[in-house]
Amino acid sequence: MNLNKAQAQNIASVLAEALPYIQRFSGKTIVVKYGGNAMTEEALKNGFARDIVLMKLVGMNPVVVHGGGPQIGHLLERVGKQSEFIQGMRVTDSETMDIVEMVLGGMVNKEIVNLIHQHNGNAVGLTGKDGNLIRAKKMEMTAFNEDLNAPELIDLGHVGEVERINTKVLDMLIQDDFIPVIAPVGVDEQGHSYNINADLVAGKVAEALHAEKLMLLTNTPGLLDKQGELLTGLNAESVAALIEDGTIYGGMLPKIQCALDAVQNGVESSHIIDGRVEHAVMLEVFTDEGVGTLITSH
């Protein structure tokens, strides 16, 4: 097929724009949290896999951490078990934890690995149990009890938080040119499994690997101001002000906090990007404009 002059110039322009980013990030680790619409729509799923394979091909080291909340909810519904949430966290009893582990570590994780393989990448699927990757501890949550007029401890069951990341297995895979794909299931010293928020796991993995970037895919354009306009660049000081004035609230609050914690602990930059845009990861990494909100420490 022959390209006309305009098409040829457009392709050349795109490649020229990508070149400095390829040079800058070659050899660097980029942690990508994969979730939301990007996990359910076929075009977005294939676009994501191609983006990850391209990053690896040009010398970057992508590490994928994935969620799977809707898939967990669907299977729980099929087995007749109702989902319960407290402050956005899924209450996870032992039976639910078995299903969470099966869905995240089995179905979802292996689907992503297979998708990357279909686009000629080399991926290895892991949970936090593999290589003692994610050492977890039970999450403690409190809520104010009006009857007691005091804070009350809430038992979420097998919901955990990251205590530490063991990077040995990740370092080995990266050195051997594999793409790690991580399911956010952790384990404590007694061998108990925990369901952990995928954003939190991605942030801690990025910190432990001293990643260049942490990228969190969402179902929004990024962080929006009170007028609904995209905020493209923020630092720690401006994030604090936006939390104070109520611009950042609800479900976006823990995501932003995770991104902020990462840049304050050695990650160069965090990005909240629109996973509903096809090839969102590629556009954020390889173009001047990007497709979301950039967060830095200063």
Curated annotation (Swiss-Prot):
The name this protein carries in UniProt is Acetylglutamate kinase
UniProt source species = Hydrogenovibrio crunogenus (strain DSM 25203 / XCL-2) (Thiomicrospira crunogena)
Catalyses which reaction? N-acetyl-L-glutamate + ATP = N-acetyl-L-glutamyl 5-phosphate + ADP
Sorted alphabetically, the keyword list is: Amino-acid biosynthesis, Arginine biosynthesis, ATP-binding, Cytoplasm, Kinase, Nucleotide-binding, Transferase
Tell me which GO cellular component terms the UniProt record holds: cytoplasm
Gene3D superfamilies named among the record's database cross-references: Acetylglutamate kinase-like
- The EC class name is transferase
Q: What is the lineage of its organism?
A: Bacteria, Pseudomonadati, Pseudomonadota, Gammaproteobacteria, Thiotrichales
Q: What does this protein do?
A: Catalyzes the ATP-dependent phosphorylation of N-acetyl-L-glutamate.
UniProt cross-references to Pfam families, sorted A to Z? AA_kinase
